[in-house]
């Protein structure tokens, strides 16, 4: 059953007294020795990688499980994203409905249903709506408002020894802010992928495309008549194959092609090929390859070569040493860059960026007496990377950034009743130094989480997230602070009727600490969601 971030702090404290998205993240696991999967060229640049702590009751995860994605600026409390109805495989239910509300206006509605659900066919539809409204803590009490929704359809069809995956969605959103007035967006996506096995060869072929339209808007505080409509059109294809050489090794190749056409801008493209060799032994798994990208259209160097290397050494079940180096070109779709905040306007095409190298080395120790520990060091360089910029008509600007980043993680679990985890990450931060996926140029990121399960069906948690040294680049090459994020949140959920009805609530930014998302756009104060989930 899908877990929720839940009950208001007062309710949580009352419960604990009687008995004794946190930011959402998405984990994408790619095992190149089984199902090769190239990095998505349209990957949201507004997300930053975050180390996932090993679960204390399990062996150390494979290298692909060490990274997840979490949001930089949690402006509101969205429900879990709907792409597939969030039902456990063992559930006899075929649909769900989530509804959450928090005054004065934070609203979340999520629903999904599996129309067909058998061994060969799974056809699902789902939808989601998120909305919020709040006033900035300034002299004018500026109003910030957002409403957005999407509907999805997903098909997973087994055909022979292969699978056909088809996805379609439509989306709409609109926002208003004091800094950027208002803008609306409408768009849709269609993709299909086929993967199958033929003898010793496993292969995959896919196509995808989307269209997004952004309406006219006028920057606040300017005399401009307004910027005209802008449309993003994108298409792509990818293919991959891997062949087994012997019991321990495989060889493979991945091919991708993406293009992006934006109104009044040159059509851009990236064509890439990634050959690699993968090897698995008793205590070691790894692969060695290179991503060779050719850019089409637009200025700049068109040919780039980046490493595609990963390895994990596990001499025992309590220790793992891992290494990863990657990179490549990517197209900057407006939809992905607005993941930083939906209040960011779309004005012009954002071009193409390149990551020559993003390398990480680290280790994990544990679980030892239910305690796990990890550490890593990383270095990365990015060119023409779109970073927030303090100008009303240019909210993003291409920049070349490099940075060294290091972090520590720790976790402890006592049976199934108590789990505690913490992390601390630090990176170089200045006008020219920044971790490229931290668009707020933070210099420190600290987080902690406490989970308690005192009764069957009752889950309580508390979280703290800190992002320090946040800043934005200004005209003239200097930076201005955006304010530190200090976010304390708490919640709980309770299964009123097992596998049928849950109630949940969550509160975020309990201390109501404000900070800037962009120049002139302030975060929301105390907020959350109170609601329920119904399975049917």
List where the protein language model places each region.
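Transmembrane beta-strands of outer-membrane beta-barrel pores
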Residues: 101-103, 129-133, 159, 170-176, ...
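Outer-membrane beta-barrel "beta-signal"
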Residues: 23, 494-504, 524-536
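Flexible loop and strand-edge segments within Gram-negative outer membrane beta-barrel domains
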Residues: 132-152, 167-202, 208-234
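Outer-membrane beta-barrel translocator/receptor signature
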Residues: 77-81, 88-138, 143-151, 161-162
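Residues that define the transmembrane beta-barrel architecture of outer-membrane proteins
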Residues: 91-93, 105-107, 145-149, 182-188, ...
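Outer-membrane beta-barrel domain signature, especially the mid-to-C-terminal portions
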Residues: 335-352, 381-402, 427-449, 461-495, ...
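Residues on the lipid-exposed face of transmembrane beta-strands in outer-membrane beta-barrel proteins
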Residues: 111-115, 151-157, 188-196, 237-243, ...
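Repeated loop/turn-to-beta-strand initiation elements of outer-membrane beta-barrel proteins
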Residues: 119-124, 161-166, 197-205, 245-253, ...
